[in-house]
Design a protein with these regions (language model features):
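Active-site and adjacent substrate-binding regions of carbohydrate-active enzymes
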Residues: 1-209
Length: 209
């Protein structure tokens, strides 16, 4: 992405995203330790995305930090490619448990499940049975729980969007420079003639100096 941004420079804006309907949740893909797939990590990924010289695309549920849904049977999947992957894994000699593990990690159903608006039976999305089961974390990760709390992921994204809107000359139109760091830190500088911001993101599990 940094290479693309440098090549485009002032010619055009790239479209940047962490998630879409054809991939698992970004917290599961990009955060190795399951214990770290939390609000802090979701904000970090948001920081990586929102201040680039690009048009950021926020996929439904990303703004509240939704993560993959662990399913206990292949019958719980709707995505045809997930069923094909499961069958192929069995044909290659993997056990049913191993095949299901692979599918849970990779399935497109992870980002195709209903939006979690609240902790009710169908997550505030509907009052009838859903085409896919509600995410198992819906009672903890939902819009209603986050909407009035400034410390949650949703507030971070709202503030980041407001910051972009208030600083178009800097964050949208300003220059972009990737900063030289170690492999576990992603940092970049945005600047115009009078202001600058430096965005530093520690992707490791330890404090960095």
């Amino acid at each position: 992405m940094h290479y693309l941004l440098l090549k485009l420079k002032s010619i055009s804006l790239a479209g940047a995203f962490h998630e879409n309907h054809d991939m698992p949740r970004s917290l599961n893909r990009l955060v190795k330790n399951p214990a770290d797939r939390n609000g802090k990590a979701a904000k970090l990924l948001g920081s990586l995305l929102m201040f680039l010289k690009s048009t950021p695309y926020i996929y439904e549920g990303e703004e509240i930090g939704m993560i993959n849904n662990e399913r206990s049977s292949i019958d719980e999947f709707d995505d045809i490619s997930s069923h094909n992957q499961y069958t192929r894994a069995l044909e290659e000699g993997y056990s049913k448990e191993e095949a299901l593990h692979f599918v849970n990690r990779r399935s497109r159903d992870n980002t195709r499940s209903p939006m979690c608006w609240n902790s009710s039976e169908y997550g505030g999305f509907s009052d009838v049975k859903l085409w896919l089961a509600l995410n198992e974390h819906a009672s903890e990760i939902n819009v209603e729980k986050q909407i009035n709390d400034p410390d949650f992921v949703l507030s971070f994204y709202k503030n980041a969007i407001a910051l972009r809107q208030e600083n178009v000359d800097l964050i949208v139109d300003g220059s972009f420079e990737a900063l030289d760091t170690c492999d576990e830190v992603v940092a970049y500088r945005r600047a115009n003639d009078s202001e600058e911001i430096i965005c530093i993101n520690n992707m490791s599990e330890r404090n960095m100096k």
